Amino acid sequence: MSHKDEEDRGPWHGRIDVHEGPRALRWHQCVKMLAPEAPPGIVLLGFPCDLGVRRNHGRAGAAEGPAALRRTLANLAWHGEWPVYDAGDAGDVGASTHDAGEQTLETMQGDYARRITALLEAGHVPIGLGGGHEIAWAAWQGFAVHAIREPHPPRIGILNVDAHFDLRTAPAGNSGTPFRQIAADCGVRDWNFRYCVLGIAEAANTAALFDRARALGVAFRLDEEMGARDLDATASTVRDFLAGIDWLYLTLCLDALSGACAPGVSAPATIGVEPAVVEAVIRIAVASGKLRLADVAELNPSLDPDGRTARLAARLVWRLAREIARRPCDVRSGLHLPARD
């Protein structure tokens, strides 16, 4: 590969096992830059933004998350049978604009939303690379525009693995408000707000937030109820939620995971959920055939000196892609729903 070719592929370069044969491939050898007429596949879309985290008085640095995720994904083993594309980053934010000069949170979210809509319209399954959890409001806006174009709009559900409800009330949107914003948008559209959160830390959510969650009909499990021994009960919660929806948006906030595994986030968990449990949730979500959109949020490389959080985030993206690749036909099966009575 020439130096020019390596530059064109950005972070997608790494080890090549030349003596291991044609099946010894890694992501950097297989991920393609997204072309307009590309066949349906998995599309990585970066959201290099932490403006919402800053507004929420969190620790900045998640804007560098997408770049760190791609670098870490590059050397993972490739087992895919469905294409994976890289669509670059929403907003095209440079380092000088991270303080919201030329780019505001709302313009970043608007660009991400438009690109999500376009990817869904083209038949792709987008996986967002965050960035702060303000990515969720952006993702929802793009997903909703796609959904309302269906002859019979689907019942959309959001499954969030997160230590926080992110239902805060604030003068302006931030990383702590996306699901309150989504609930309000559902009210405007006369849609039911279908939201399930796994990994809630009781010590990190005020009584007011629990009250709001219950008033909105949010399903949730506490982090202390999501150990390995609780996996059957967690799986039952997820399957019950999936039974009541047609399309799923899965969002994984890294602050739900044990702080020992994921220290590189704005607000590390003191107990958290083990990675194996999150992978089990991913398997169930994809196996339902209802997943249309996913993302991983809150990776902060500046707080991740040994890269363990980036490796875990990359593993979760890898798991998502691996499970989707095993059943692409099922993932696509719900895009045109029959009429319901």
Swiss-Prot record:
This is Formimidoylglutamase. Pathway: Amino-acid degradation; L-histidine degradation into L-glutamate; L-glutamate from N-formimidoyl-L-glutamate (hydrolase route): step 1/1. Binds 2 manganese ions per subunit. Catalyzes the conversion of N-formimidoyl-L-glutamate to L-glutamate and formamide. Transmembrane segments: none annotated. Gene3D superfamilies: Ureohydrolase domain. Its EC number is 3.5.3.8. Keywords: Histidine metabolism, Hydrolase, Manganese, Metal-binding. GO terms for biological process: L-histidine catabolic process to glutamate and formamide; L-histidine catabolic process to glutamate and formate; putrescine biosynthetic process from arginine, via agmatine. GO terms for molecular function: agmatinase activity; formimidoylglutamase activity; manganese ion binding. Mn(2+) 2 binds at residues 162, 164, 253, 255. The keyword Kinase does not apply. Pfam families: Arginase. It catalyses: N-formimidoyl-L-glutamate + H2O = formamide + L-glutamate. Mn(2+) 1 binds at residues 133, 162, 166, 253. Belongs to the arginase family. Its cofactor is Mn(2+). The gene is hutG. The keyword DNA-binding does not apply.
